[in-house]
Amino acid sequence: MGSLEKERTTTGWAARDPSGVLSPYTYSLRNTGPEDLYIKVLSCGICHSDIHQIKNDLGMSHYPMVPGHEVVGEVLEVGSEVTKYRVGDRVGTGIVVGCCRSCGPCNSDQEQYCNKKIWNYNDVYTDGKPTQGGFAGEIVVGQRFVVKIPDGLESEQDAVMCAGVTVYSPLVRFGLKQSGLRGGILGLGGVGHMGVKIAKAMGHHVTVISSSDKKRTEALEHLGADAYLVSSDENGMKEATDSLDYIFDTIPVVHPLEPYLALLKLDGKLILTGVINAPLQFISPMVMLGRKSITGSFIGSMKETEEMLEFCKEKGLTSQIEVIKMDYVNTALERLEKNDVRYRFVVDVAGSKLD
């Protein structure tokens, strides 16, 4: 084993400016310490939030930026205090790679809500080095922010790491895990299609809600949804009033909330998971008169991610993906912006030429 104190270099694909165009970029990895893993990246999913970051949609981007937070890799080296992982293990890591370890969320296994969390890219680590993501040959991650990938789950299924736990966590936290509930999925993209699969596996009746009819066959026949509702169909929306216990709103652009609040039963929950950098509006009687809630949820903890992966393994759930090489990544990002993917791009990093 080599020295864990030495710096290493790796090559990733980085955005240099808000154009969001990625190209090869060689940089130093942060020093690895006693609790760290040095990981060879095998594959990395592409999430819509990656587009927000590389194009500076949120006004917080720093360049050069190597995106990618749905990462599966092979452990090449472990620090002296690493206890859960060994060289050769297949592991996954996500969007959070650091936290304060002392606040309420950290002490209750909800580190993704720590106010001092460190993002896996477009942030600065405790040693002052910029963090960079999974569109790269290697990464260094602390053992607290890594999970073991179950045997039988393909490495390319790393999209489950983000999309899967984004729906699994709120279903568990909001007491919506029991069978027999009626749920809605607004938006049939990467998160939405996993929402259908996970909710169905929990025994829920699932309605997909979309702006057009073009995904009806896919939703009902391929993903197993029970019903399909077009939001512009006034009669259909009216008939569905007060019919759902919850709705996952995965839409990442500004849209009205009131039509969907009307679909919720008494005490129903509208759960926001799409990143929107603009105000959303509704009139208060829409929630008051049905004791309804508009809430949000952000990915899931590492503990919940482990639970979700085991749940997916047990139920045989996988993400529907399109595997690409790194030299196609810019085209894939353009297609993702147009919603032209079913339902998640995954980069075969280990099989790609990076330089």
Curated annotation (Swiss-Prot):
Q: EC number(s) of the enzyme?
A: 1.1.1.195
* SMART domains according to UniProt: PKS_ER (SM00829)
Q: Which residues bind NADP(+)?
A: 49, 166, 187-192, 210-215, 250, 274, 297-299
One matching Pfam family: ADH_N
Q: Which GO molecular-function terms appear in the entry?
A: cinnamyl-alcohol dehydrogenase activity; coniferyl-alcohol dehydrogenase activity; zinc ion binding
Cofactor field: Zn(2+)
Residues the record lists as binding Zn(2+) 1: C47, H69, E70, C162
Q: Which residues bind Zn(2+) 2?
A: C100, C103, C106, C114
User: What is any one GO biological process for this UniProt entry?
Assistant: lignin biosynthetic process
User: Assembly and interactions?
Assistant: Homodimer.
What family classification does the UniProt entry report for this protein?
Answer: Belongs to the zinc-containing alcohol dehydrogenase family.
Q: What does this protein do?
A: Involved in lignin biosynthesis. Catalyzes the final step specific for the production of lignin monomers. Catalyzes the NADPH-dependent reduction of coniferaldehyde, 5-hydroxyconiferaldehyde, sinapaldehyde, 4-coumaraldehyde and caffeyl aldehyde to their respective alcohols.
Q: What PANTHER family does the record tag this protein with?
A: ALDEHYDE REDUCTASE
The protein's name is: Probable cinnamyl alcohol dehydrogenase
